[in-house]
């Protein structure tokens, strides 16, 4: 292995043995190199040692595995990883369950559902509420809630309860007072019970099951001792993205003296609150470990960028729950380059002029630049202006664009809207997980209206309500129609980036003079041929300007980054009907006699303020 020069702080991390260690690793601090070398040092000290390296995204786990295999020559020592574990947190849970199926109460042959498969089973369980004879108590609770909520709103409440079940929301609802909460609890328990039974009959597990059963297994003292003895190093990357259940599972791998634990993370980069990731989990664990290290030398960005980041973020982070640790630039400055520019633009078109100038006068390749958007909704003006300027842009969901199921579902929507007789396309759109119309409902609608569209538009589904404004417009702009699908933050999170890529293609075709039907025909042909359009990232499209959301850009690097639309205020996420916090419990928002949310509810006002504060804190971390 070639010799790598480490910073003094990196060397401390590599050389720390025999006591629990927490590492706060700032952006661009050489974290992955440090972790690989720590594993190398472990095997150098004792070739028979074993390590478990856990990360929280497929991308980071794959990158870590690739670098470990290359640097440590693991492939040449009796297997792909020679007994070491390098995997995501859900991969870790699956491995635990597979090795200890009997303790988990399973047979060990269970398969793991994809998100779409789990969504389908859940919808089938929910459909029992509408199409089967219900126990009297369940029927009463259902009718009570339907008097208060629309069907779509109730489905959203049930989905939210399901997503929070692992974290104790049912217990919190049990302790809540009020008939509304009790009715929601009873209905949720009924649907969840049938969902669980459906999975058991099929021999399948979802991601929540992986965490739940792994937690059960790791309660066994013998299992704990076996793993604690087996793994001489438990290395946890991206720990700022963990939730309490995942943290508890990992902690069971740790020896009583904590000598085999090294957790790495950066609370300033915790941006997965919607998955119940909690930055406080990382901070509390760090407080329990005796050895604390800080990696804040930045080897990635120019000094001017680091200075600007420190100047802005030190002030921004002052009132937040995360302490800001300034980065120290280690790259050589370029005296001929101003690394940070502020562009005061009168309109988006001026951005296109500026980018062209960078290409023509400063020889900056387009593929070295990226435009970052805070969100998709409301920012299409930037893309329209860039396209109108003749700048080729590359946006999409990454990978093979037309193989993304969300792209296919949205294309089916356009095909159906173009011609209502394309019922199969309409059904494909309606049953998409982010739309969520059940097969039984679709079948019922087809019996009443073979073309489906009119009944869907008459429903109280939020997408239907958004689309209804276009139902009598034969000349509707397809790009505008696409953007109307982004009715809330949840749907934007699910399909926003895929829709952005498709929207860009629609705009390109429209500027060529193609009408709605011709645009749809071109898109359908591309989808049916599965044209292998590779979007960025990766790989980058030569000669094209990349457009990403801030959230989608995490973990990527570009020589030139353009942040747009930062002058506007950060919007808090839409206030949920069911508020949740693992410490505060739950609160179900009240309704008045007309079914509207009570405007003057002091209790809900406190929850809204709390949600706004948390959303603002995460927006700061996303900006960093």
Predicted regions and their residues:
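P-loop NTPase Walker
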Residues: 1-107, 179-180, 197-198, 202-208, ...
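Conserved SF2 helicase motif VI
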Residues: 576-581, 621-624
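ATP-hydrolysis module of ASCE/P-loop NTPase motor domains
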Residues: 55, 78-83, 102-184, 292-300, ...
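Conserved helicase/translocase P-loop NTPase motor core
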Residues: 86, 90-93, 184-233, 245-249, ...
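Helix-hairpin-helix
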Residues: 430-447
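Conserved motor-region signature of P-loop NTPase helicases/translocases
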Residues: 1-66, 70, 116, 124, ...
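Active-site-adjacent bridging/hinge elements
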Residues: 96-98, 185-189, 284, 529, ...
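C-terminal accessory regions
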Residues: 434, 541-545, 551, 594-624
């Amino acid at each position: 292995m070639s010799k790598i020069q480490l910073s003094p702080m990196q060397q401390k991390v590599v050389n720390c043995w025999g006591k629990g260690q927490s590492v706060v690793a700032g952006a661009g601090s050489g974290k992955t190199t440090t972790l690989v070398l720590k594993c190398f040092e472990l095997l150098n000290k004792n070739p028979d040692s074993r390590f478990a390296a856990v990360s929280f995204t497929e991308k980071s786990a794959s990158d870590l595995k690739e670098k470990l295999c290359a640097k440590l020559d693991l492939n040449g020592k009796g297997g792909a990883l020679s007994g070491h574990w390098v995997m995501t947190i859900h991969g870790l849970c699956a491995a635990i369950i597979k090795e200890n199926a009997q303790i988990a109460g399973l047979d060990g042959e269970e398969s793991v559902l994809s998100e779409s498969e789990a969504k389908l089973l859940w919808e089938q369980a929910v459909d029992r509420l509408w199409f089967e004879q219900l126990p009297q108590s369940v029927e009463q609770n259902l009718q009570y809630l339907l008097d208060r909520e629309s069907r779509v709103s109730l489905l959203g409440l049930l989905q939210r309860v399901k997503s929070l079940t692992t974290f104790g929301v049912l217990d919190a609802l049990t302790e809540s007072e009020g008939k509304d909460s009790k009715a929601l609890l009873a209905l949720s328990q009924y649907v969840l019970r049938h969902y669980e039974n459906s999975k058991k009959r099929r021999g399948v597990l979802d991601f929540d099951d992986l965490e739940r059963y792994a937690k059960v297994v790791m309660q066994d003292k013998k299992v704990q001792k076996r793993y604690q003895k087996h793994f001489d190093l438990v290395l946890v990357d991206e720990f700022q993205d963990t939730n309490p259940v995942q943290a508890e599972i990992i902690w069971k791998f740790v020896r009583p003296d904590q000598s085999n634990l090294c957790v790495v993370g950066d609370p300033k980069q915790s941006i997965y609150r919607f998955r119940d990731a909690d930055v406080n989990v990382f901070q509390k664990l760090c407080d329990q470990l005796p050895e604390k290290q800080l990696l804040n030398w930045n080897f990635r960005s120019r000094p001017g960028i680091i200075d600007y980041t420190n100047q802005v973020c030190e002030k921004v982070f002052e009132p937040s729950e995360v302490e800001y640790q300034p980065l120290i630039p280690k790259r050589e400055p370029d005296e001929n380059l101003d690394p940070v520019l502020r562009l005061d633009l009168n309109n988006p078109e001026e951005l296109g002029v500026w980018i062209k100038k960078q290409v023509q006068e400063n020889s900056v390749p387009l593929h070295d630049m990226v435009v970052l958007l805070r969100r998709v909704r409301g920012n299409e003006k930037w893309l329209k202006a860039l396209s109108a300027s003749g700048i080729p842009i590359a946006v999409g969901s990454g990978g093979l664009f037309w193989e993304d199921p969300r792209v296919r579902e949205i294309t089916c929507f356009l095909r159906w809207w173009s011609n209502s007789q394309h019922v199969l396309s309409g059904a494909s759109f309606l049953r998409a997980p982010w739309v969520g119309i059940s097969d039984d409902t679709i079948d019922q609608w087809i019996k009443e209206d073979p073309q489906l569209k009119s009944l869907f538009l008459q429903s109280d589904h939020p997408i239907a309500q958004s689309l209804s404004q276009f139902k009598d417009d034969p000349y509707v702009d397809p790009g505008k129609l696409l953007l109307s699908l982004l009715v809330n933050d949840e749907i934007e999170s699910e399909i926003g980036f895929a829709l952005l890529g498709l929207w860009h293609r629609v705009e390109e075709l429209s500027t060529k003079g193609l009408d709605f039907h011709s645009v749809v025909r071109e898109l359908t042909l591309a989808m049916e041929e599965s044209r292998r359009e590779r979007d960025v990232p990766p790989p980058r499209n030569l000669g094209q300007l990349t457009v990403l959301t801030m959230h989608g850009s995490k973990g990527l690097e570009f020589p030139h980054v353009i942040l747009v639309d930062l002058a506007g205020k950060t919007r808090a996420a839409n206030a949920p009907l069911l508020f949740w916090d693992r410490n505060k419990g739950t609160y179900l928002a009240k309704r008045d006699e007309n079914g509207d949310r009570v405007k003057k509810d002091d209790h809900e006002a406190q929850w809204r303020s709390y949600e706004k504060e948390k959303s603002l804190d995460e927006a700061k971390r996303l900006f960093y």
